[in-house]
């Protein structure tokens, strides 16, 4: 079967416009990496925000990374922490590590070694105590 990226993109857009968070998450990647479309971080952020607001943990983590680096949005460490926390609370290990790093570095939150360790332990599957 031959892949038809244009057809797939059409259907992802249709599903994304109808509010499908998984399709919106995929569209975020498509636009971030320019897979069959012009690469556009602003458009990636738009799709990830749509999915993140519906509770999609992967999109929340991706949106956090965009805020952390200032790609497609104004750099905002506080917003990065907010979105990583949402993903981390759903068990996303990468988000837990990144949230721990933010506490370690005091970026977007007050520096707090104990809070950083709590998130690192969660990411490692250990007790958060």
Q: Predicted segments — roles?
A:
Residues 1, 26-33, 62-69, 73, ...:
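Hydrophobic face of amphipathic alpha-helices that form TPR/SEL1-like repeat modules
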Residues 4, 12, 17-20, 33-35, ...:
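Short helix-capping/linker turns of helical repeat alpha-solenoids
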Residues 46, 82, 123-127:
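Alpha-helical tetratricopeptide repeat
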């Amino acid at each position: 079967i031959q892949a038809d990226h244009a057809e797939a993109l059409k259907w992802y857009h249709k599903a994304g416009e109808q509010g499908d968070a998984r399709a919106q998450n995929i569209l975020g990647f498509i636009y971030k990496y320019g897979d069959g479309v012009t690469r556009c971080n602003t458009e990636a952020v738009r799709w990830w925000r749509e999915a993140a607001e519906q509770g999609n943990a992967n999109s929340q983590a991706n949106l956090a990374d965009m805020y952390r680096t200032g790609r497609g949005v104004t750099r905002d460490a506080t917003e990065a922490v907010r979105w990583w926390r949402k993903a981390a609370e759903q068990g996303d290990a990468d988000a837990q590590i990144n949230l721990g790093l933010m506490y370690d570095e005091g970026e977007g939150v007050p520096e707090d070694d104990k809070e950083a360790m709590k998130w690192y332990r969660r990411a490692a599957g250990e007790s958060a105590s």
